[in-house]
């Protein structure tokens, strides 16, 4: 199963979300699931974090996921087309990010009010 974990966000609880998402990522069996870590910066930009972030938190119970920008930006494209849902932009190319389940580990504004969930539902 392809699982996307969303964390961070434009909220005063940004850091709390990073700690919570680290715990979630630590407890999903990466041998059975493909886990994509998607950080949302305090400015609202979405980035796909490298696999090394997942490995870091799974090896160290005190490690916290990063929210640093990467070369892979994530966008949400509404609709039901080939390039809809969560998509990765890298080197000027856009491709769908295979996703079966999104785990929104977002606290505070835009997370607990259902806004992000609504956006994802529109994107199918």
Positions of PLM-derived features:
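ATP-binding N-terminal substructure of ATP-dependent carboxylate-amine bond-forming enzymes
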Residues: 1-124
């Amino acid at each position: 199963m392809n699982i996307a974990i969303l964390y961070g966000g434009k909220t005063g609880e940004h850091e709390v979300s990073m700690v919570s998402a680290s715990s979630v990522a630590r407890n999903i069996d990466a041998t059975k699931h493909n886990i994509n870590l998607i950080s949302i910066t305090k400015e609202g930009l979405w980035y796909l974090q490298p696999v090394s972030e997942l490995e870091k938190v799974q090896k160290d119970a005190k490690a916290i996921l990063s929210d640093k920008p990467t070369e892979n930006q994530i966008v949400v494209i509404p609709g039901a087309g080939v390039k809809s849902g969560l998509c990765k932009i890298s080197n000027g190319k856009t491709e769908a990010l295979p996703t079966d389940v999104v785990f929104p580990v977002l606290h505070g504004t835009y997370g607990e009010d259902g806004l992000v969930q609504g956006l994802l539902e529109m994107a199918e």
